[in-house]
Amino acid sequence: MKHKGAILIVIGVVALAAMILIIGPGEIEDALRKADPVYVLMAVVLEFIILALFTLRWSITTRAVSIDVGKRHLFPMLLVGMAINNLTPSARGGGEPVRAYMLGKYSRASMESAFATVIADRGLDTFPFIFLAVLTIIGIVLYFDLSRWILAALIASVVIIVVAFFLALYVSVDRDAGERITGWILGVVKRFYRKNHERLERRVRSALHEFQSTMRMMLKEKNVLVYGIPISFLIWILEIIRVYLIFTAFGTDISLLVIAEVFILATLIGMIPLLPGGLGAVDGIMIVFYSYAGVSPSVSAAATVVERLISFWMISAMGVAAIPYFGSSVSEKLMDKL
C-alpha cells in the first residue's frame, strides 16, 4: 500500500476513534455486548446475497456484448474493485478501471469493451439513487431541522450527480458529442505531448469508437435494462434492510426511511475524494444522523461500527485476499493501486 493511502486510512481511523472517545467507549462496549448475534449473522448473510446480486448484474452487461466470463470469475474481480474503491481516496471510482483491466486480461476482451460493461454496471445504480435521493430530501425536510444551506448543498450535489450521469451517458453513445469532447481533450494534450501526437490521436479516437459501439450495443440489449434496473433497486433495498437488521440486533426500532436517508447522505459523503471510502467522515455522518433521529449515541456508534465492519472492512479484506487469484503479474499492478 502506498504511504499516502496508508496515512489517509490512519487519519480516518483516528477520526472515528475520536468520535468514539467523545461518546464514551464504555457505553459503546456495553451496547456491543447486548447485540443479538443472530441478527448480526443475518446481516452478514445478507451482505453476501448483495454481492451475488452485484455479480449477477455485471454478468448481464458482459453477456450483452458477448464477453465470455463466468460469474465465479466476475465475483473476485468485483471484490477487488470494491476494495480499491474503499482503500483509495478516489470518489469510489478507482476500482472501476481495475475491474475493467482484470476483465480484459481474463477474457481477452478489449479494454474499451470491458470498461463499457463496468460503466454500464455502475450506471444502473443511478436509477435507485435518484429515487432514494428524492425521498431523502423530502424526509430531511420533514424529520430533520437542518439549515437551508445544508439542504441546498444536498439538493445541488444530487442534481450535479444526475446531470453528470446523463451527460456521460450522452457522450458515451453519441458519436458527435464524443468526438467534440475527445477533440477538446486532445487539444489540451497536444500542448504538452508534442511527439507522435497523430498516433496518439488515432489510438484515442479508435478506443472512443469501440467504447461507444459497445455502449450502444448494451443499450439495445433489453435484458440490461429489464433485469439490471430491478436488480439495482433490490440491491439498494437489501442494503437498507441490512442496516435495519443491525439496529434490530441492538433492540432498536428505527424507520427504514430514516435509514435510507442516512444511507444516501453517507453515499454522497463517501464520493468526496478526501479519505479512502469516506472513512471517518461516513462513520461520523451515520452516528450523528442516527442520533439526531432519536437513537442513543452509544447505540448509533455501536451499530455504525458493526455496519462498517460488514460493508467496508470485510469487503476490503476479501478484495485484497482475492488479488492473488489473478496471478503474480496482475497482482503486482493491483497492489500498486493500494
UniProtKB/Swiss-Prot annotation:
Main subcellular location of this protein, as a coarse class: membrane
Record field: transmembrane: 6-26, 36-56, 124-144, 149-169, 231-251, 254-274, 275-295, 310-330
Any Pfam family hit: LPG_synthase_TM
Transmembrane helix in keyword set: yes
Membrane topology recorded in Swiss-Prot or TrEMBL: Multi-pass membrane protein
Cell compartments where the protein resides: Cell membrane
GO cellular component, one term: plasma membrane
Keywords: Cell membrane, Membrane, Transmembrane, Transmembrane helix
Family: Belongs to the UPF0104 family.
Protein name per the record: UPF0104 membrane protein MTH_1261
Organism name: Methanothermobacter thermautotrophicus (strain ATCC 29096 / DSM 1053 / JCM 10044 / NBRC 100330 / Delta H) (Methanobacterium thermoautotrophicum)
